[in-house]
């Protein structure tokens, strides 16, 4: 059976080239209202594994103006929200990338979309509360607070 030209180029490509092509096909865009059901479905497995906190549809609607999705051939494969607290501070929230699309740089592109939005809005700092420290360091985040200060939290409700 003769090899089709597209098959030949695929077989000649290195694994890194194939990953780069796959990643390049993914687009990052602002969230639309009609994405909400797909976002909830995307983040649900991460919530079930306690990787992400649960988000209601209402919470996602509030984040709508400052949220982004990653889309691959019409399929939603990533989500991130930027919660803007003030001109001083915003937080990256609910970053999720479909398992079969991880390690393609999609998460970094989603985080960068949030950082770019914060810059355009003049927000001074963007934070991330995460268990994936290494990932956020790759995105340019660090642990520094002025002086020897640390961020401390107290729960005001029972969960």
Model-identified regions with their sequence ranges:
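Short, low-complexity Ser/Thr-rich regulatory SLiMs
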Residues: 82-86, 99, 145
